C-alpha cells in the first residue's frame, strides 16, 4: 500500500490494515468465484488506489450509495477509508452480494449496508453522494438515481475515455470537474450549495 502516499492519500494504519485484509480476502474469493478481472494481489491494490484517489479532491459525504459495486470497487473500499460515512452498496449479482456481506462482517465495517438489488429498486432518502464505476453511461446513471438524490447530492463516476461524449448527452446545467489520472477520468458532479 506504499502507492497511497505517492498519490497523496493519507490513511491511518488501522484503515491500511483493513484495506490489506480486503485485498487478501478478495484474492482468495476471486480464485473460486470469479468476482473481478483483477486476478493478482497487485492488480487488486491498483484497483484500491483507483478507488481511493478521489479522496484527494471530493467533499467527504455523510451518506454514500455505490451503484453496481461488483467486488467492492469503489464502494467497499471507500467504506473502509471513510468509517464515519454510511455506505450503501447496490449490487444485483448474488455471488458478489455474498462476498460483500462477508467482507463487511469480516472487516468489522459497521457503516456498510449491502442491497441485493439493482439501483432502480433501492429505496432510501437522498444520498449525499452517489458513486459508480463501469456500470453505464452518465445520463442513464443520473436518471436511475433521480429518486434517491436531491439538489444537494454529488456524484462521483469513475469513467474512461467516453466521459466527454457522455457529458454532452446530459441535459441541463451542472457543475462538474473531470480529473484525469492515467486511463481514468473521475467525473465529479458537484452541488451548488
Swiss-Prot record:
Where is S-adenosyl-L-methionine annotated to bind? 68, 73, 119-120, 133
Does this entry carry the keyword Transcription regulation?
Answer: no
- Offer one Pfam family short name for this entry: GidB
Give EC number(s), comma-separated: 2.1.1.170
Q: Name one GO cellular component term.
A: cytosol
- Where do the coiled-coil regions begin and end? none
Protein origin, superkingdom: Bacteria
Write down the top EC class of this protein.
Answer: transferase
**Which keywords does this chain's UniProt record carry?**
Cytoplasm, Methyltransferase, rRNA processing, S-adenosyl-L-methionine, Transferase
Q: Which GO terms describe its molecular function?
A: rRNA (guanine-N7-)-methyltransferase activity
Can you state which reaction this protein catalyses?
guanosine(527) in 16S rRNA + S-adenosyl-L-methionine = N(7)-methylguanosine(527) in 16S rRNA + S-adenosyl-L-homocysteine
Principal subcellular localisation of the protein: cytoplasm
Q: Any idea where this protein resides?
A: Cytoplasm
What family is reported?
Belongs to the methyltransferase superfamily. RNA methyltransferase RsmG family.
Provide the function of this protein: Specifically methylates the N7 position of guanine in position 527 of 16S rRNA.
Query: What protein does this entry describe?
Result: Ribosomal RNA small subunit methyltransferase G
Tell me the organism.
Sulfurovum sp. (strain NBC37-1)
Amino acid at each position: 500500500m506504499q502507492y497511497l502516499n505517492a498519490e497523496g492519500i493519507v490513511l491511518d494504519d488501522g484503515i491500511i490494515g483493513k484495506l490489506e485484509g480486503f485485498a487478501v480476502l478478495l484474492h482468495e474469493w476471486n480464485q473460486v468465484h470469479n468476482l473481478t478481472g483483477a486476478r493478482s494481489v497487485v492488480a487488486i491494490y491498483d484497483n484500491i488506489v483507483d478507488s481511493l484517489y478521489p479522496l484527494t479532491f471530493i467533499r467527504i459525504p455523510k451518506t454514500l450509495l455505490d451503484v453496481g459495486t461488483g467486488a467492492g470497487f469503489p464502494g467497499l473500499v471507500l467504506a473502509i477509508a471513510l468509517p464515519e460515512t454510511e455506505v450503501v452498496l447496490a449490487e444485483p449479482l448474488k455471488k458478489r452480494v455474498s462476498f460483500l456481506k462477508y467482507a463487511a462482517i469480516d472487516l468489522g465495517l459497521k457503516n456498510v449496508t449491502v442491497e441485493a438489488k439493482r439501483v432502480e429498486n433501492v429505496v432510501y432518502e437522498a444520498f449525499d453522494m452517489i458513486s459508480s464505476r463501469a456500470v453505464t453511461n452518465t445520463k442513464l446513471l443520473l436518471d436511475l438515481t433521480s429518486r434517491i438524490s436531491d439538489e444537494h447530492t454529488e456524484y462521483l463516476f469513475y469513467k474512461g475515455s467516453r466521459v466527454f461524449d457522455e457529458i454532452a448527452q446530459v441535459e441541463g446545467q451542472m457543475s462538474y470537474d473531470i480529473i484525469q489520472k492515467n486511463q481514468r477520468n473521475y467525473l465529479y458532479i458537484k452541488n451548488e450549495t
